[in-house]
């Protein structure tokens, strides 16, 4: 198999592009580095294309390794024909490869292997040849052997049919055809074990749909219902069609003696061996497809959450709401440094509202707080009412925002949080996290396991290794897309930088603590375990403001410093001029093709350098929608059908999007209500987490706490 050609066809890109990326990966380059600094080499493939390429490359290389193992095993058995070898080499999927290997794979003792041990293979061959001129019973008498425990004709025939049933089940072409027919004509069926029981799975109590039309969220919901022993699930295959197909393949000539036995054997082979295996394979395939889709959605949601714009330059009060144990508050300054913490008790059972207002007002005055970040967990609504009431009594403009606190409790109890705030309890740490999430969502959220951030669907039911890897890639892409301040970044943030491992991240922080601020990127080479390759991979993503070289504060890679300096000189600038940005530089450097030749660099790279010099250290998050800050409260009972509201998309799932409209119960915009202009294949084609949108209230169900919305575009 030509792996590069295969991937190029699948991803609809050029073979040379795939070969270039394969070479870079084999040299130890990371995807963020390849995406940003090797565009010339691979023709400007984007992050997503590169991730898909890397994933397929890993799969196909593993497949090639498995082929070598399979070929060696069959050759060792002396059963490898040229035809079989070519079939194995041509196999493009793991499933097809394993189908080809099935007849030769070492087996545990089966009914067929036991029958072979009893010497019944000859009888099986006679039946399969369909040439007998006398009864099968007569033929079977020759195979009776008391020593081998074949004492009756029935035993001999039964054993022979077992051998044939397994041979039929192991035939790769048959399995491929049956799998295809089942997928095309079969149905996924689920029923309730107890139809009277009220559960969230009632939609699946009497459910049936064609396999080819099962959606990802249906597969995952049914799987969970089965796991919780609420649903019984099966695949209903077109059995008559399949048995007809097998009969046509196996019974090549009608024989009054052998045909009845072959028909019996075919039915047994299908029902006992083929059908259960195909059902397992198809359900695994449905699950894998559903998981891949859910992971993709989770990744997109996570990306949007991490790329929320920072609210810079504000002193923030983080508010972690609670009832019995009190609300934990933490004040953090513009840089995220903790200035103060306190516990207040405005909620049940103590209801110290007046005292809470007095304390918080004093904190607002003392620290010049302009924003309150309230966690959306238990007692959030009660806290919000107290805050809104208090804000009306202030003589200064202070706003609040309800912040998704998912994962804050996980972080606050973690080893990392303990190291960061050894003298704080978990509530205080959580309040700090809730405040910092507004100031720099990316820097704070990287401290939390992405699976705990709360923007996924059925994440606990998925392949955890695959999920963690995919989400880790998303975080890595976001961190490198934004860039990291080398002198302020935590080890948690640094470890996602291209080329930086956990150990190197800790070593960078240690070096900083022992030697003070980094003054240049070159200084990174003094960090323990950070060698030339790691430096090449990470340097461009690590920024130094106020360092020796102004280029260290940009995304220009050190390997291009000479070119950047030469370019500036040609256009009449000096290095020092780039500090505030060189607006209009691209207009001065119109003929990029000619300029690229003059400075000795590729045109694509030159354009990137010019773009960066125009606005050094640009933050892509600045282009994202800003969060909605509030000063008044809206309650669910205030909602009326037809109301137009502004909200923030909190989560996107296969069947719609949940929108926060400020009433502590997210409303659902069903996929059919996202737009009236076109068919929507997936909600992510229309909205993303963090989008600020206008919605209309369609229906409010106070009893079930459900709000149905439609999008206004």
Predicted regions and their residues:
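Long, highly charged, low-complexity intrinsically disordered interaction regions
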Residues: 3, 55, 62-79, 89, ...
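Short flexible coil/turn linkers enriched for glycine and charged/polar residues
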Residues: 14-15, 27-28, 94, 108, ...
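Single-stranded RNA-binding regions, centering on S1/OB-family and related RNA-binding modules
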Residues: 547-713
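Short, ordered loop/turn segments at secondary-structure junctions
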Residues: 37-39, 238, 321, 334-335, ...
């Amino acid at each position: 198999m030509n792996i590069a050609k295969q991937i190029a066809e699948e991803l609809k890109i050029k073979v040379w592009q795939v070969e270039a990326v394969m070479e870079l990966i084999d040299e130890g380059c990371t995807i963020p580095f390849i995406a940003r600094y090797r565009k010339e080499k691979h023709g400007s493939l984007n992050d997503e294309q590169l991730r898909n390429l890397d994933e397929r490359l890993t799969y196909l290389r593993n497949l090639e390794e498995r082929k070598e193992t399979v070929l060696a095993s069959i050759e060792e058995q002396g059963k490898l024909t040229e035809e079989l070898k070519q079939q194995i080499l041509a196999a493009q999927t793991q499933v097809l490869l394993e189908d080809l290997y099935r007849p030769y794979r070492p087996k545990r003792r089966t009914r067929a292997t036991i029958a072979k041990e009893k010497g019944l293979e000859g009888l099986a061959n006679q039946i399969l040849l369909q040439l007998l001129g006398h009864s099968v019973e007569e033929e079977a008498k020759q195979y009776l052997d008391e020593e081998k425990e074949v004492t009756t004709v029935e035993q001999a025939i039964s054993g022979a049919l077992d051998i044939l049933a397994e041979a039929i089940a192991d035939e790769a072409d048959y399995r491929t055809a049956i799998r295809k027919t089942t997928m095309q004509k079969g149905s996924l069926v689920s029923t309730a074990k107890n139809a009277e029981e009220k559960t969230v799975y009632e939609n699946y109590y009497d459910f049936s749909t064609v396999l080819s039309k099962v959606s990802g969220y249906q597969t995952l919901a049914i799987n969970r219902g089965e796991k919780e022993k609420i649903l019984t699930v099966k695949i209903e295959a077109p059995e008559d069609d399949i048995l007809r197909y097998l009969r046509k393949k196996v019974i090549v000539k009608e024989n009054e003696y052998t045909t009845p036995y072959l028909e019996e054997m075919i039915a047994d082979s299908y029902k006992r061996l083929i059908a259960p295996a195909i059902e397992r394979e198809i359900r695994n395939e449905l699950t894998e497809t559903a998981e891949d889709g859910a992971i993709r959605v989770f990744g997109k949601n996570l990306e949007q959450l991490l790329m929320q714009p920072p609210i810079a330059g504000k002193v923030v009060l983080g508010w972690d709401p609670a009832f019995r144990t009190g609300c934990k508050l933490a004040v953090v300054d513009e840089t995220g440094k903790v200035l103060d913490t306190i516990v207040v008790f405005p909620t049940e059972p103590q209801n110290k509202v007046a005292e809470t207002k007095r304390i918080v007002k004093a904190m607002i005055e003392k620290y010049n707080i302009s924003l309150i970040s309230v966690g959306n967990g238990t007692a959030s609504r009660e806290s919000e009412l107290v805050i809104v009431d208090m804000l009306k009594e202030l003589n200064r403009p202070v706003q609040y925002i309800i912040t998704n606190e998912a994962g804050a409790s996980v972080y606050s109890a973690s080893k990392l949080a303990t190291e960061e705030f050894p003298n704080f309890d978990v509530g205080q740490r959580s309040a700090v996290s809730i405040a910092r999430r507004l100031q720099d969502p990316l820097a704070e959220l990287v401290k939390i396991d992405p699976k705990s951030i709360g923007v996924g669907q059925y994440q606990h039911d998925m392949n955890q290794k695959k999920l963690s890897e995919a989400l880790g890639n998303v975080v890595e892409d976001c961190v490198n897309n934004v860039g990291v301040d080398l002198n302020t970044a935590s080890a948690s943030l640094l470890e996602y930088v291209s080329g930086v491992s956990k150990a190197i991240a800790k070593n960078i922080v240690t070096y900083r603590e022992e030697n003070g601020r980094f003054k240049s990127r070159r200084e990174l080479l003094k960090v323990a375990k950070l060698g030339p390759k790691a430096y090449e991979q990470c340097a461009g993503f690590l920024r130094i403001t106020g360092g020796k070289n102004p280029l260290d504060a940009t995304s220009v890679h050190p390997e291009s410093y000479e070119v950047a300096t030469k370019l500036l000189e040609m256009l009449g600038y000096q290095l020092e001029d780039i500090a505030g940005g060189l607006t209009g530089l691209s207009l001065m450097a119109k003929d990029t093709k000619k300029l690229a030749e003059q400075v000795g660099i590729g045109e694509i790279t030159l354009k990137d350098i010019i773009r960066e010099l125009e606005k050094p250290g640009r933050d892509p998050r600045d282009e994202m929608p800003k969060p909605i800050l509030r000063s008044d409260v809206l309650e669910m009972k205030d909602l009326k059908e037809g109301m137009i509201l502004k909200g923030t998309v909190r989560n996107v799932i296969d069947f719609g999007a949940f929108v926060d409209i400020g009433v502590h119960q997210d409303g659902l915009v069903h996929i059919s209500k996202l737009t009236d202009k076109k068919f929507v294949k997936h909600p992510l084609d229309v909205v993303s987490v963090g989008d600020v949108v206008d919605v209309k209230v369609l229906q409010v169900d106070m009893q079930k706490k459900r709000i149905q919305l439609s999008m206004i575009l």
